[in-house]
């Protein structure tokens, strides 16, 4: 093809009608079409550069999700806990904004916004942390504080948390250094009493001190591929300075510490008068928690200082538990309906059954965590027989199934 007859493969314009005509293999593109392509990519929030794969800095080549967008995503998975969601969203947004603009705070030292979640068992602490990491597309790992020990003791030392985090991103150090670590049951490693221990304990203050080093930022030496440490071995160095740590716990008994502080009262103008009702709302008390309360509970002051954002979660009531059963994308009722649907059987939960399930979970003090075991128990026999029940059209779970252990109603094709 002569130069004069060459045309853009996209718009059909000839070389004489455009400034530039770029030649490829058996194709041409003009400068105008290139400009249009760039505009389209910008409108899609992509500047044309390849984005980082899963587990890197959140949406590196695109827009960092705003706090409102993060909360909207959390609403799809977690019912209620609006204040906790806002606190988490703002802290996480500020954290990754700080990482994206390291030079912006050249004259100001921007601290890391590590988070402490306080709330009863089954209120959604773990699910919130998991959902956050999923939305931000960063490596995420969970650790149980009760299984951790100081280095040198039998058990899982705190540096193994970083080993697990590396494993989540195929030992990509850069990705791991921007990940999220959730440490559950942090309240279970509180030291006994207000005064520091004379001797270090394996599972209490000593573990807090070890965690403190990770949280405030240190270079952890991790064995390659997660193996055990041994002499003459090369280690992977991971800087934990920019890893976001979220700690959670039920803090049973903390309300007594807060009540003791607030009920001291006084005489004169400005003195607070507080009720000594033992049935005072624990959620409201958690909402006014102060660092001094956490110190009295048994957390060391240095650790509390590294967890500047404190978010409290409410105990879930009956209506909230019913919503958890039916509303989120991963709602239990929807999950079981999908399983039954695979056998071409409709599954229905009556309102009375849902309320009974929620009531039993509240009585067990297990919150949302206890819902699955209750539903599983009432459907176990039916699911066992389901593949062999020819002509079954519908299964109805009523109140009596939950409260009296009766079989669900089976509706067959007529």
From Swiss-Prot:
NCBIfam families: clpX (TIGR00382), PRK05342.1 (NF003745). One of its GO terms (cellular component) is HslUV protease complex. ATP-dependent specificity component of the Clp protease. It directs the protease to specific substrates. Can perform chaperone functions in the absence of ClpP. It comes from Neisseria meningitidis serogroup C (strain 053442). Component of the ClpX-ClpP complex. Forms a hexameric ring that, in the presence of ATP, binds to fourteen ClpP subunits assembled into a disk-like structure with a central cavity, resembling the structure of eukaryotic proteasomes. Keywords: ATP-binding, Chaperone, Metal-binding, Nucleotide-binding, Zinc. Residues 1-49 form the ClpX-type ZB domain. InterPro entries: AAA+_ATPase, ATP-dep_Clp_protease_ClpX, ATPase_AAA_core, Clp_ATPase_C, Clp_protease_ATP-bd_su_ClpX, ClpX_bact, P-loop_NTPase, Znf_CppX_C4. Belongs to the ClpX chaperone family. GO terms for molecular function: ATP binding; ATP hydrolysis activity; ATP-dependent protein folding chaperone; protein dimerization activity; unfolded protein binding; zinc ion binding. ATP binds at residues 120-127. The keyword ATP-binding applies. This is ATP-dependent Clp protease ATP-binding subunit ClpX. Zn(2+) binds at residues 8, 11, 30, 33. GO terms for biological process: cell division; proteolysis involved in protein catabolic process.
